[in-house]
Structure formats: C-alpha cells, structure tokens
Amino acid sequence: MAEAAPQDTQQHFAIQRIFLKDVSFEAPNSPVMFQKEWNPDVKLDLDTQSRELGEGVYEVILRLTVTVKNAEETAFLCEVQQGGIFTAEKMEAGQLAHCLGAFCPNILFPYARETISSLVVKGTFPQLNLAPVNFDALFMNYLQQQAAQQGAEQA
C-alpha cells in the first residue's frame, strides 16, 4: 500500500534582493542656511507599500521622508524609497500581513537610514542618525485603527 506523499506545509521566508528604488535630497536654502546657528527641527514621515510580484514573491517599499527646518526655514528635505523583494510562502493571511507590514520594513530600515545619513553628510549638514522604528507597534496600531473603523461603519 503506497502512502501519499506529505504536503510541504512549512513556512518559508527569504530575502531575494534589497534595492534603492528612489532617492531625493534638496537643500533649497543653501548656502544661506550654513551661515545660521544650527537648531534643527526634524520631522520624519514613513510609509510602507507591498505588492505581490508572483506566487509567494512580494515587493515591499519603505518610504522615508525627512524634513529638517532651522529657524522656520527648510534646511533640507530627504526622501528615500528602499525596496526589497522577499519570498514569503505558506503563511496564513494574518502572518503574511505582519511579515509584509512589519518584518520586511524592519529589514529595510537600516539601509534607508544609512542612505539618508550619507546624503545629509554629502550636503555638508551635521550627521543625522535616525532612531530605530518599532514597525511591530506601528503595525498593531494600524490593525487597531482598521478594526475601529470597521466597527464604526457597522454601527
């Protein structure tokens, strides 16, 4: 009696590629900005996007926009879109959403942070080291907002 071959149900995750998709650095008020006392106000905006490229293969984009103002004037604006191609197979929907919305951005963030730091230094501004981001907490907040919004729509 032949036994049926067991189906492979083991989850699989792999990084295929990490790449820089888009980058921009603007210093609209230089060189005048270099003559002023440096007391920066740093604003960080971030966003993630993901899309399926093929069966079990996903592109995740982490977009970071850093705007630094000094004395109410923009010193510089830096935007980086750090991309990654990931294999994520045999995951339940919730696990896949967490993987694409938190785990992959955690992998991409150090690359984007290094690119921003390098661009800022090349613009001859003081080095900017972005603090780590807790993408797991951001993802949980997103899920809570989605649940609250669905609850409000049903009421």
UniProtKB/Swiss-Prot annotation:
GO terms for cellular component: cytoplasm. It comes from the Bacteria. The lineage of its organism: Bacteria, Pseudomonadati, Pseudomonadota, Gammaproteobacteria, Vibrionales. Pfam families: SecB. Belongs to the SecB family. Homotetramer, a dimer of dimers. One homotetramer interacts with 1 SecA dimer. InterPro entries: SecB, SecB-like_sf. HAMAP family: SecB (MF_00821). This is Protein-export protein SecB. One of the proteins required for the normal export of preproteins out of the cell cytoplasm. It is a molecular chaperone that binds to a subset of precursor proteins, maintaining them in a translocation-competent state. It also specifically binds to its receptor SecA. GO terms for molecular function: unfolded protein binding. Keywords: Chaperone, Cytoplasm, Protein transport, Translocation, Transport. One of its GO terms (biological process) is protein tetramerization. It is found in: Cytoplasm. NCBIfam families: PRK05751.1-4, secB.
